[in-house]
Design a protein with these regions (language model features):
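Bacterial N-terminal signal peptides
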Residues: 7-16
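Positively charged n-region of N-terminal signal peptides that target proteins for export
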Residues: 1-5
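Compositionally biased alpha-helical segments
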Residues: 22-404
Length: 404
């Protein structure tokens, strides 16, 4: 797919300094220092691989350490291997021994640093002090990263040359001419608004929509597009100059699209499939999202679990014998729309006959039908009622989970 590179559009005004003024328009861009094995340091705006550019973008891999899986009854264990897609990325999820490997997903804003520990491994240091060893699973591991250093300009650093990447607040004097895509997406399930990644990839006004018209192939910068609507197996594209086009022949404009990602503040990140998609209307904005310092240090999940026998268990919780911190996510789907919800935003989870009713702290309610965290595929809940006492509940014994 054709992509005009972001970094040729970066202009650095003056000296780059650590720290950022509160609320400046460029605060959402990834920024930090790359230390290499040759003891050199490069500081500037970062693009991870060819996709992630903002603090609310996700670093994906697979967890190597599974401290809670030993509480799963032996009869519920098994050896399997599966390739799943998580918001546009293929993640290889394997079962090691008797335990299911688990996906690692964290926003870059929740990460202090990433240290490669081999070709397919890394240590991810999170705000709050915890460290997760991750192992392969997506192209976020083992891929090169691009940094725009103030003295050198654009530099691509191969994974095998990286010693450590340390993140820090984005300075206000970094000038990026490209805008972050944002707008409103209408679907069969209603409207979603926020920052947009088209085809789980294009996120900037300089990125291009590829397709064919009756007159030939086209590659249109998103900054020139007003709206895109699904029209059967094709797309109706309306340009800012008023022209209408019907495009086909690429995964940007037909049913082979890898999904439309929307960072909707009500839910977190949603992925909209072609069948659910109706139309997107873009809006011009210089906003790039939350600043690095706007992501607080995470903490353990605590709350109350009521079981189907009426007993109440209060304490620290590991949902699905996996998610135990506020930086982690609850995932579920319905009507060709996937939701990846930060657990810090979840108020309660109530298992239903099919899926779960999830209530968010902002008041929104979601009836999610698919996804390991919300269905009968869940490995249940582990509750530390005291530091020395743990209670395990299978998912079909959980009536409701309320988070503090």
């Amino acid at each position: 797919m054709t992509r005009q590179h972001l970094w040729v559009l970066l202009v650095v005004a003056g000296s780059l300094v650590a720290g950022a003024a509160d609320g400046h328009p460029l605060q959402g861009f990834l920024y930090g220092t790359v230390e290499t094995l040759s003891k050199q340091e490069y500081t500037g705006v970062i693009r991870w691989g060819k996709e992630e550019s903002f603090w609310d973008d996700h670093f994906n891999s697979v967890k190597e350490n599974l401290p809670y899986q030993k509480y799963l009854p032996e009869g519920q264990r098994g050896r399997r291997r599966k390739l799943i897609e998580i918001f546009g990325k293929d993640v290889d999820v394997a079962w090691e021994g008797d335990y299911a490997a688990r996906q690692f997903v964290a926003r870059f804003g929740d990460i202090v640093s990433i240290e490669p520990a081999g070709k397919e491994r890394a240590d991810v240091h999170l705000k709050g002090g915890s460290v997760e060893r991750v192992n392969g699973g997506s192209n976020d591991i083992g891929n090169e990263i691009t940094i725009y250093d103030e003295s050198l300009g654009e530099m691509k650093v191969p994974w095998e040359r990286i010693d450590k990447v340390t993140f820090r607040s984005t300075p206000s004097n970094v000038d990026v001419t490209a805008r972050r895509l944002s707008g409103d997406v209408t679907t069969v399930a209603g409207e979603f608004s926020g920052f947009i990644q088209w085809d789980s990839d294009e996120c900037l006004s300089t990125d291009k929509l590829d397709g064919e018209s009756e007159d030939g192939k086209m590659s249109i910068p998103f900054g020139k597009i007003r709206s895109i609507a699904r029209e059967g197996a094709h797309s109706r594209v309306k340009l800012a100059d008023g022209r209408d086009l019907t495009l086909f022949g690429s995964n940007d404009v037909d049913e082979s699209i890898r999904g439309i990602l929307v960072e909707d503040p009500r839910y977190g990140r949603v992925k909209i499939g072609w069948k659910a998609f109706e139309q997107v209307t873009f809006r011009e904005s210089r906003d790039t999202g939350r600043a690095y310092e706007d992501y607080p240090a995470p903490h353990e999940i605590r709350g109350t679990v009521r079981d189907t026998d009426g007993h109440v268990h209060t304490g620290r919780i590991a949902i699905d014998l996996d998610e135990a911190y506020t930086w982690e996510f609850l995932n579920g789907s319905r009507a060709d729309i996937d939701y990846l919800i930060p657990l810090e935003s979840v108020r309660s989870i109530e298992p239903q006959r099919r899926g779960s009713l999830v209530v968010l702290r902002g008041g929104a309610q979601l009836d999610l039908r698919e996804g390991k965290d919300v269905s009968d595929e869940s490995d249940g809940a582990l509750i530390w009622t005291r530091e020395t006492m743990k209670t395990y509940l299978a998912w079909d014994h959980v009536q409701r989970i309320d988070l503090d």
